[in-house]
């Protein structure tokens, strides 16, 4: 369970992800969003997935504010668009969750976008969560990439965070 926060724009953050993460992170994002509904609304939650990893820092972050929830929802949808672009079909999780998760859970706080938790080994952490996730992604997650077909490193933004 994680959110690869590679850019503050949820669309751009989705584009930067390796193929395997585009596939996997759609479901993980939906699970975190569904868990937000369960934790906030209890038995009134009408969402496709049961709660998962309630106490994971990323799952907690998703339900801390409406803005966090919205960021993750838009990121999930952008991952879905990336999936469709790369694989030519719609991800089943998007089919199940797009409408159900579009609405914020009733009672979620409106406290603004909060700092993304850094769910990674300490050696990659940084004052800036985006830089930390790039450190983690490039150094720890490159083994899942097909470097013959994926050109992530060329796409990486040149600015320092």
Where is each model-derived feature located?
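Sequence termini and other peripheral, non-core segments
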Residues: 1-55, 59-161
